[in-house]
Every structure is written in structure tokens, then in C-alpha cells.
Amino acid sequence: IVMCTPTATPPKWLVDASPDMLAVDSRGALRRFGSRRHYCFSSESYLLQSARITREVAARYGKHAAVAAWQTDNEYDCHDTTLSFSENARVAFRSWLKDKYGDVADLNRAWGAVFWSQEYRSFDEVDPPFQTVTEANPSHRLDYRRFSSDQVVRFNRQQTDIIRELSPGCDILHNFMGVSTSFDHFDIGKDLDAASW
């Protein structure tokens, strides 16, 4: 048996209890419950609940003789779900930028923000690259994709760490989408034993 963590589709009761886990699209519209992959990788409340259910399932089945391997979540980025423009993502992105650049002047230089008067006075002014009148700054968009990829890696790593603790010796894989480019598959792969599609 390959056991899969049940985190790709948070149930309605959990969404109702922690609505901040829902993703937001680039126009600022909430991605509501009713399908799958409706969570935001930057939601700390969902990260906590994902760890909780992963721990419960791995504790219960981790040493069962029939369990040959584990799969984390399912199909990261299916339905264009890596990028979220939620308040959680905004806060996490600002922190990521502070860690990367240290000073907002360095960010402005790296992004060529003088063009079209896009300079920032502090990291607290930087939002995710929401849909704009025309194309947003390409350096801004690239950094947001790198940040978002790091959020997926963090989410996946949390699950692999728990599974390795509670189900030692079992391989861990992820069922990737074939042509997704919104996150770094190789970074995710560092925490896996196999990749599937």
C-alpha cells in the first residue's frame, strides 16, 4: 500500500474553522471551498492542521506491514494552485524579501524599481504581484514565484519529516504534475525518495 497524506482537500468544517487557509487569486478573489487544492501554502493555520493529520495518520499506519511507501499531498500546482495572493502570503512574502535583500534599497535596485515609479520605502509596502493594468515588474513576479516555491517546499518537508519520524524505512514520494513550472520540483525532490507522475 502507498499511503497518501489527506491534505490536498481540506474538508468544509476545517475551512469554516480557519477560513484564512483559503487561497486568493491574482485579482484578489477568494478561492472558495467546493473543489480541491483550495488552500494557501502560506497559511500557518493550515500548516498546523496538515501537520496534525499527517502525524495522526503516520502514527496509526506508519509501522503497518502493508505500508510500503508514502505519498505527500497530491499534485502540487494542479489547477494553478501554487501561487496565492492571500494576506498570509503577503506577510510571508515580505519576510522572505527581508531575508533575501536585507534592505529595501537593495530590493529596489535588484528589481529596477525606478522604472514606472515602482520604488518602495519599506518592505511593508510590498504586496504580491496582483493583476495590474499591464504586466507587473518581471523581477517582482520572479521573486514571488521563488517565494511561492519555497512555501511548497516547506509544506512538503513538514510532511516528510513527520513520516520519516513515524514510519522509518518507508520510501516517500510525491505525485507531480507533468508540466508544472510554478515551483522547483528539484527542491521538493531533495526530501523525497522517488518522484511519480
Briefly describe each language-model feature range.
Residues 1-15, 56, 60:
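Hydrophobic or amphipathic alpha-helical targeting/insertion segments
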Residues 17-19, 23-194:
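Polysaccharide-binding and catalytic clefts of secreted carbohydrate-active enzymes
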Residues 197:
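Redox-cofactor binding/interface segments in oxidoreductases and associated redox assembly factors
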